[in-house]
UniProtKB/Swiss-Prot annotation:
Function: Part of the ABC transporter complex PhnCDE involved in phosphonates import. Responsible for energy coupling to the transport system.
Membrane topology, from the record: Peripheral membrane protein
Species of provenance: Nostoc sp. (strain PCC 7120 / SAG 25.82 / UTEX 2576)
Domain ABC transporter: 6-244
Protein family according to the UniProt entry: Belongs to the ABC transporter superfamily. Phosphonates importer (TC 3.A.1.9.1) family.
Gene name of the record: phnC2
Catalysis: reaction(s): phosphonate(out) + ATP + H2O = phosphonate(in) + ADP + phosphate + H(+)
Lineage: Bacteria, Bacillati, Cyanobacteriota, Cyanophyceae, Nostocales
Entry EC number(s): 7.3.2.2
Name of this protein: Phosphonates import ATP-binding protein PhnC 2
Source domain of life: Bacteria
Amino acid sequence: MSDYVIECHNLETAYVGSLNRPILNEISCHIKQGEFVVLLGLNGAGKSTLLRSLVGLVPLVRGEVHINGVAMNSRILPQIRRDVGMLFQGGGLIPQLSAIENVLCGRLGTRTTWQTLFGFPKRDRLLALELLEQLGLRELAYQKTSKLSGGQQQRVAIARALIQSPQILLADEPTTGLDVIATQQVMETLAELHAQQGMTVIAVLHDLGIAARYAQRAIILDAGRIVYEGSCDNLQAQFVVNNQ
């Protein structure tokens, strides 16, 4: 059995005329269970596209993604999306809903319309409250998310991703637009999930210092290709060398 929970084999997306290349071009990489991996690169390098391809949100013209040794296809995609939580850039919360209601939205994919017609089951609500408490948001559970700070909103988004009990968490620029304190809160939350629960975390980041502090391994992309894969030591030098 493979040691890898994620395997990408020669991923390629459609050719983009404005770029004169595919967004992803022959991408191959492997990620082990329990790793904290950061994706780095300039704007347009393909970081977010690679992340989204891991849950079938990007059409590929070539290559395969394997999750837990199984090739991704339309038949098993629902199961993969239960095993892989996704934290979108900006959180993707519904501002008119409360924190707990946004967290419960993470259960929509596993509940039928009939099950949610009269509200979510009590066990779902208890789990949502438990997750918010773990993230220091219990007292804000019934507050509209539009009233929360950026860091609080991002932690609500993390709780929403966690309510499906994923094995893997993907975070697309989770600190974008946050101040220093909120950024630290969000990254500490991801680090705790990784360290205490053994969760596999893959995050797209721009700050090399934050990447070096929290991640175990870095993958640097340039023009749709992987140009570096390895330790987070001396990332500044690696980034400069590989983006010249």
